Regions:
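Conserved N-terminal beta-strand and adjoining loop/helix that marks the start
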Residues: 1-20, 35-38
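A generic fold-level signal
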Residues: 3-5, 15, 27, 78-80, ...
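A short local loop/turn or secondary-structure capping micro-motif enriched for an aromatic residue
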Residues: 29-32, 105, 144
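N-terminal first-folded block
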Residues: 22-33, 41
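Unchanged
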Residues: 39-62, 72-124, 151-159
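Charged phosphate-binding loop/patch that engages nucleotide di/tri-phosphates or the phosphate backbone
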Residues: 129-159
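Short, charged/polar surface micro-motifs in flexible loops or helix N-caps
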Residues: 17-18, 28-29, 72, 88-94, ...
């Protein structure tokens, strides 16, 4: 039976500096990304996003706006991995320097593009930073490899 895995990712932006909060992940999905994680059983998508930001950054966020998603579909198993995207400029609390997930800090959007990013995070940024798209869809499976340019063999469809 096909599985569905639900996760979230949150762009927290400082309204005064326009810098965004990033995480330099060191365990899984290594590289620069926005904070986020799994939706737990019995938890709303929104509440899971608030909880994950708190756990990974120490910040309390509110008034999150849903801004899109990425839908990964495994063509061999029919499993689905869905990441719900949120963003906010409203937060409080003391920022942690790091957690077991990695270092967290504010930086400019321009600087992010020059940092070593988590896999496919550059594609996700297109949805977070533009009102042009609300979804990325991708068919993939474990047999697909990177091509000679180091790019994945699968296609990202923006909607």
């Amino acid at each position: 039976m096909a599985k569905i895995e639900l996760t979230n990712m949150v762009m927290v932006q400082n309204p005064e500096t326009n810098e965004v909060l990033v995480q330099r992940r060191v365990k899984y999905w290594c590289g620069i990304t926005f904070p986020g994680g799994h939706v737990e059983d019995g938890e709303s998508f929104y509440d899971s996003a608030v909880r994950e930001v708190k756990e990974e950054t120490g910040l309390d966020v509110k008034n999150l706006k849903h801004c899109g998603c990425v839908h990964w579909h495994n063509t061999e198993t029919n499993d689905k991995y869905i990441v719900l995207f949120y963003k906010t400029t409203e937060y409080s609390g003391e920022l942690l320097k790091s957690t077991d997930e990695g270092e967290v800090f504010f930086t400019s959007i321009k600087n992010i593009k020059d940092m070593p990013l988590s896999p496919n995070f550059d594609k996700y940024l297109d949805v977070f930073l533009s009102d042009k798209y609300t979804e990325i869809f991708c068919n993939w499976n474990e047999k697909m490899k990177e091509n000679c340019d180091g790019e994945p063999d699968w296609n990202f469809e923006y909607r």
